[in-house]
Amino acid sequence: MALYLRSRALLVRNPELISDVHFYGNEYYDNSQCFPAMIAAVRNLNGELVTLHKTYLSPDGHKADVSAPKRLSRLPDDRTINGCAIQLGKPDQVLAVAEGLETALSVAIATGFPCWSCLNAHGLQTVEIPACVRTVFIFADKDRSQTGQKAAKTLQNRLAQQGVLACIVSVEDEIPESAKGIDWNDILRDKGPTAFPVMRPVH
């Protein structure tokens, strides 16, 4: 897992940040294949484990060469993924949110704020925020399809109705010609943590 995180420029100095993220050396992908895997707990707002997010890895620390290197475990019948997140850090009054796990880790490392991974655009729209949080920074993916940007705006509007200040933090760089989008992990890898804006909570 350390090799994979390093390949994504994710240098985690605070072990508590990834206390819900673990490495398994031999995880079943299907009936005939096993791979090393980075496995993260997906929890609801009450902190209850709902499912597991698995990233299958190659021995050299990259994503495994399979059709779906990222998967969620099957949900129990009495659970829903809506509102859940991989909770990287415990918020006080300020929380950052992002889509993918690597993006959320990038934000947490660069800004020092806890950042929850909502897994995807739908998860970003539906994530539930603790009552103690008064300011949310939404680190939006920048997609050609506008999916990430629209999800961020949907969350911002919902939080505003709840009396929570939500600020969208957008990637200003252009999307590379060969890519469908760009996110904050791309910024961290290309430019380092100093390329992130300085975030100050508003009280």
Segments and roles (model prediction):
Residues 1-38, 43-46, 89, 199-203:
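TOPRIM metal-binding catalytic domain and adjacent DNA-binding surface shared by DnaG-type primases
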Residues 7-11, 57-61, 138, 170-173:
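Short regulatory "switch" loops immediately downstream of catalytic or recognition motifs
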Residues 9-11, 51, 111, 188:
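Generic short alpha-helical hydrophobic face used as a protein-protein interaction/packing hotspot
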Residues 24-32, 63, 176-186:
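Short, solvent-exposed polar/charged micro-motifs at secondary-structure junctions
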Residues 29-131:
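Phosphate-handling DNA/RNA-contact segment within nucleic-acid enzymes
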Residues 92-95, 101-203:
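TOPRIM fold recognition
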